[in-house]
């Protein structure tokens, strides 16, 4: 998995457990693609301060994931839903009743919504 995507997921899951400053800096860095210099200028702190906060915040996120495993569980569930969706799409609906085909289509759409959220 892409390191930036993984870090952004960790921030989504555990970000509110960080200090406000760490969350703000990591959010600007990961979700808004700010550079260290841009964050430093925006928050009136040194680049070293930004770097240290990113390092500490990321370490905290990693420790939380190691203990709780919520992102790992989320990704497993998403992959399972994708497998189910693939199986549903492979079903031949030509021999189904119109009503059964509509139900299957609704199930497919709901699973797609789950995967995309």
From Swiss-Prot:
SUPFAM superfamilies recorded: Sigma3 and sigma4 domains of RNA polymerase sigma factors
Source taxon at top rank: Bacteria
Pfam family, one: UPF0122
Signal sequence region: none
Function in brief: Might take part in the signal recognition particle (SRP) pathway. This is inferred from the conservation of its genetic proximity to ftsY/ffh. May be a regulatory protein.
Family: Belongs to the UPF0122 family.
Name of the molecule in the record: UPF0122 protein Cthe_0771
Organism annotation: Acetivibrio thermocellus (strain ATCC 27405 / DSM 1237 / JCM 9322 / NBRC 103400 / NCIMB 10682 / NRRL B-4536 / VPI 7372)
């Amino acid at each position: 998995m892409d390191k930036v995507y993984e870090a952004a997921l960790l921030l989504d899951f555990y970000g509110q457990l960080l200090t406000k400053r760490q969350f703000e800096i990591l959010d600007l860095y990961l979700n808004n693609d700010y550079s260290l210099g841009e964050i430093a200028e925006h928050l009136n702190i040194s680049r070293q301060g930004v770097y240290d906060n990113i390092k500490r915040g990321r370490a905290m996120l990693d420790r939380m994931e190691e203990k709780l495993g919520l992102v790992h569980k989320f990704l497993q569930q998403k992959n399972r839903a994708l497998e189910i969706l693939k199986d549903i799409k492979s079903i031949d609906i030509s021999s189904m009743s119109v009503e059964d085909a509509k139900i299957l289509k609704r199930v497919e759409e709901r699973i797609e919504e789950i995967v995309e959220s």
